[in-house]
């Protein structure tokens, strides 16, 4: 099912319409609640980008990037200060989802699967250096950090272990 963009003629043009001004805070709220829920329940998934996906698909990559960035800043100021650093990852996710959606990559199950791999790769490429700098390569997710520990114990490079941890 193809969704129509909100007041957008080009993927990169951004019009701050009433719909977009409503969508961005809604997306930030969805991100915030989903991220807090996932962290609170210690779920082995990152749910803090659901609103970013929504904004990117409905209003384009710029709106998605803005909503992801704002969420990380607000989350960082209220619940988890390190979250602010990962705002750049949310920007990358918003751009990737928006570009893929604008080019029809969410039109079939197969394309959605490929899109998920691309988005995960973008997220991991951006997050890995941040994880190495701030956490020694770990992510804070138990199963990923276990894999990281096994790889490092077997003399794998920290960068590779951290990327795999993602």
How should these model regions be labeled?
Residues 66-75, 112-120:
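Central hydrophobic cores of alpha-helical transmembrane segments
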């Amino acid at each position: 099912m193809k969704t129509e963009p909100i007041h957008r003629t080009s993927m990169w043009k951004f019009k701050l319409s009433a719909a977009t001004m409503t969508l961005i805070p809604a997306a930030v709220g969805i991100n915030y609640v989903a991220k807090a829920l996932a962290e609170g329940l210690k779920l082995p998934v990152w749910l803090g980008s659901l609103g970013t996906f929504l904004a990117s698909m409905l209003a384009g990559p710029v709106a998605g990037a803005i909503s992801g960035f704002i969420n990380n800043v607000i989350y960082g100021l209220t619940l988890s200060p390190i979250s602010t650093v990962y705002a750049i990852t949310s920007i990358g996710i918003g751009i990737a989802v928006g570009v893929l959606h604008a080019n029809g990559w969410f039109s079939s199950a197969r394309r959605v699967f490929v899109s998920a791999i691309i988005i995960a790769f973008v997220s991991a490429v951006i997050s890995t250096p941040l994880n190495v700098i701030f956490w020694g390569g770990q992510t804070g997710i138990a199963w990923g950090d276990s894999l990281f520990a096994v790889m490092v114990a077997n003399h794998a490079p920290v960068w590779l272990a951290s990327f795999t941890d993602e």
